[in-house]
């Protein structure tokens, strides 16, 4: 769940750096709502991928509940609906605190959570999946969390949001790179399909390295942001692993470590902003 926790954490930390205080209840509510939206999206994705034939015995990724027969697709979809409903209820409170911008972000996030694998043209079955993640788990989540605290939007918030969004997109890129062949068999034509493996590998390098330019972009506004450099060796190790790992289940570990990199980067950035 780090992909949903990190942007709220960073947006709130930046607001703390700006205001020297935090509205803790709205911050906690935003965190829970973001987690519920991610849970709902993952659950619906689990059921929808099974129904569309994307989860086959040849799939390299971890076992999934619907494909393994642990639960029916209908049961998983009901669980997703419960999760989305919980996020909606929390969103009512957040809308009362933050006004119409938060209402808009909340409604868009819920709609996107369904549209990711639902509807006639699912986002996950197109080349726009990484863009979706960049926008919703980067730009909107960080900036929304910051706005909830400050009722404003700054260049620094956008810079932080961009960095977190790039790393979130890298997580999805690894997933789609690993599953390219089985995805193509199910007509799931992701960005990796259109780029090819070599250019997808080059894109992964950019997504991982560009966030480390953030301290430079801040131009001494928040010198503590240089803390993120502490996880640069981890990032470089990941890039080497991605480039040399034979295609197979080893990419599950690369996927998990890419998510860990985003968590480490977000945590170090948050600490650097508030210390």
Language-model-detected regions and their locations in the chain:
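Small-residue-rich segments of transmembrane alpha-helices in multi-pass membrane proteins
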Residues: 2-11, 131-146, 164, 193-197, ...
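Interfacial loop-to-transmembrane junctions
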Residues: 114, 238-266
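Topogenic membrane-insertion module of multi-pass membrane proteins
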Residues: 1-29, 120-121, 133
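Acidic (Asp/Glu-rich) catalytic motifs at the cytosolic membrane interface
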Residues: 36-60, 170-192
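Multi-pass membrane catalytic core of lipid/isoprenoid biosynthesis enzymes
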Residues: 57-97, 191-222, 259-263
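Functional transmembrane core segments of multi-pass inner-membrane proteins
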Residues: 132-180, 186, 198-201
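Membrane-embedded alpha-helical segments that form the functional core of polytopic membrane enzymes
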Residues: 19-44, 103-111, 155-174
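Intramembrane alpha-helical segments
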Residues: 62-152
């Amino acid at each position: 769940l780090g992909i949903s926790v990190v942007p709220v954490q960073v947006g709130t930390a930046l607001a703390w750096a700006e205001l020297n205080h935090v509205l803790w209840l709205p911050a906690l509510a935003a965190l829970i709502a973001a987690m519920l939206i991610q849970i709902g999206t993952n659950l619906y994705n689990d059921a929808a991928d099974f129904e569309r034939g994307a989860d086959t015995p040849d799939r390299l990724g971890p076992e999934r509940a619907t494909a393994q027969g642990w639960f029916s697709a209908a049961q998983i979809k009901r669980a997703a609906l419960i999760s989305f409903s919980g996020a909606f209820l929390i969103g009512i409170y957040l809308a009362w605190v933050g006004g119409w911008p938060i209402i808009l972000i909340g409604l868009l996030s819920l709609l996107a959570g369904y549209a990711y694998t639902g509807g006639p043209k699912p986002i996950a079955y197109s080349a726009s999946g990484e863009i979706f993640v960049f926008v919703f788990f980067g730009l909107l989540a960080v900036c929304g969390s910051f706005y909830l605290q400050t009722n404003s939007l700054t260049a620094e918030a956008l810079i932080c949001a961009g960095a977190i969004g790039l790393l979130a997109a890298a997580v999805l890129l690894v997933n789609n790179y690993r599953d390219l062949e089985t995805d193509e068999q199910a007509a799931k034509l992701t960005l990796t399909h259109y780029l090819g493996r070599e250019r997808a590998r080059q894109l992964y390098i950019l997504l991982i390295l560009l966030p480390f330019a953030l301290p430079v972009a801040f131009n001494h506004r928040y010198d503590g942001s240089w803390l993120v450099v502490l996880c640069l060796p981890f990032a470089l190790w990941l890039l080497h692993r991605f480039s040399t790992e034979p295609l197979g289940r080893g990419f599950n570990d690369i996927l998990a470590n890419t998510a860990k990199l985003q968590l480490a980067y977000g945590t170090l950035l948050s600490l650097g902003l508030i210390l």
